[in-house]
Swiss-Prot record:
InterPro entries: Glyco_hydro_22, Glyco_hydro_22_CS, Glyco_hydro_22_lys, Lysozyme-like_dom_sf. Monomer. One of its GO terms (molecular function) is lysozyme activity. Disulfide bonds join C24-C145, C48-C133, C82-C98, C94-C112. Residues 1-18 form the signal peptide. Its main location: secreted. Its EC number is 3.2.1.17. This is Lysozyme C. Pfam families: Lys. It comes from Coturnix japonica. Residues 19-147 form the C-type lysozyme domain.
Length: 147
C-alpha cells in the first residue's frame, strides 16, 4: 500500500502538465469551446494558428526581444494578455496568470484568444497566422477530422 501511495504521489504532478494535441483532437476541443466561426474565423484558422505558433503544444513558451514571453498553444503574450510576474508593464487584459495558458485544458487559452480576436486586428494579432495561414486553404487543417 505504501508503494502505491509513493507511486501515485510521483505521478500526480504529471496530471498538471501540458499536452501535445493531435490535429483532429485539437480541432474537436476548439470546436467544443466555441471557436468555429468565432468573429468570422473558421475552425481551420485556429488549428493552423496553433500548429505554427506552438506545434500543438500547450506548454510552449517563447521569450521575445522586448522581455515579454508568449505562452501556450496559441502563444499568448505576457505584455498584453496575461501576467507572468516578470514582464514590466504587463496589461493582463485577459486577467489571468500566464501559467494558466500552459495547461492541457485549453479553456483559459480559448477564452483569452476570444478577447484577442475580438480586437480590431482580429487574427492578425498572431504573427504565425498572418505569415503561414492567412490566405491559404485553412480548411485542410480540419479535413478528415470527425467533428
Amino acid at each position: 500500500m505504501r508503494s502505491l501511495l509513493v507511486l501515485v504521489l510521483c505521478f500526480l504532478p504529471l496530471a498538471a502538465l501540458g499536452k501535445v494535441y493531435g490535429r483532429c483532437e485539437l480541432a474537436a476541443a476548439m470546436k467544443r469551446h466555441g471557436l468555429d466561426k468565432y468573429q468570422g474565423y473558421s475552425l481551420g484558422n485556429w488549428v493552423c494558428a496553433a500548429k505554427f505558433e506552438s506545434n500543438f503544444n500547450t506548454q510552449a513558451t517563447n521569450r521575445n526581444t522586448d522581455g515579454s514571453t508568449d505562452y501556450g498553444i496559441l502563444q499568448i503574450n505576457s505584455r498584453w494578455w496575461c501576467n507572468d510576474g516578470r514582464t514590466p508593464g504587463s496589461r493582463n487584459l485577459c486577467n489571468i496568470p500566464c501559467s494558466a495558458l500552459l495547461s492541457s485544458d485549453i479553456t483559459a487559452s480559448v477564452n483569452c484568444a476570444k478577447k484577442i480576436v475580438s480586437d480590431v486586428h482580429g487574427m492578425n494579432a498572431w504573427v504565425a497566422w498572418r505569415n503561414r495561414c492567412k490566405g491559404t486553404d485553412v480548411n485542410a487543417w480540419i479535413r478528415g477530422c470527425r467533428l
